[in-house]
Amino acid sequence: MKIDKYSAILGNTVGYHDMSTLTSHRPVASLPFDGKYRLIDFPLSSLANAGIRSVFGIFQQENISSVFDHIRSGREWGLSTLLSHYYLGIYNTPVENTTVGPEYYQQLLTYLKRSGSNQTVALNCDVLMNIDLNQIFHLHNTIDRPITVVYKKLHLQNISEVNAVLEIDETDHVTEQKLFDGKDPDEVYNMSTDVFIVDTPWLIEKIEEEAKKEYPQKLRYILRDLAVEYNAFAFEYTGYLANIHSVESYYHANLDMLENQKFMKLFSPNQKVYTKVKNEEPTYYSKTSNIKSSQFASGSIVEGTVERSVVSRRVHLHQGSEVRSSLLFPGVVIHENA
């Protein structure tokens, strides 16, 4: 039975990132962003806006409970109806490994074969963007290639060693890819976002071939190699993008939202971003509060000074407290005169 025209594979990250203690008890996908969101909200919202109602999330087993808690039934992203499907595949291979165990592809192949989809999109949670997937599906269906890849032109400081950079010819097709090792701060690189549109029957065939190997690679490495082998069409993404690969990049991406132009590029009126609904009271600002260039989620109490900061839900800033150029996580308490 045909369930949907499109299906999706959603991963946590494009590679291993040293995020210090931020990811000690949760994956990158569950990290807060801009006060009330989580990083996973953005790829899920891109899928929802494209009408994709069949999603397979594949995450490492460790610290997965926060993903379950946030997504729940998937109602906010249109994944809780009789005709929608959200599955969560769990694997045990360490996140820094490039190879996987047999359960990784067993789950994935079962999902793809049952989806009945024509095309599948693969994407991750650490490349933060709000992309119109309908546009890319349309382009993919007009070209004679089984795979399309999305890239973004970026400078050295915005790319990490786990990202792939692409060589693209004058007809917008991929001729080469390699892990980033750039040294020139003035050069602009074609960084792969690791967003791929692929023909589902073709993808199943390629995954079955990989799964037979003694040490099969993770999906992203297969797709990167296939993009070169089949000269994938390369689609340039020109909207806001933050490559979350370190604590510093995560911090700066949050503070970017204090700049109106960047905020509007990410939160486009035509591409709504959905998140878990919480019925909380509005944030309370006392007479002693002093606010400058900051953003607040709901449910907080502000009695102190806040400048150029992003404040999450249920934060209490006591009288006399001062917060500047900061990102405050949910439930934080800043005491008096701190």
What are these regions (language model features)?
Residues 1-255:
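Unchanged
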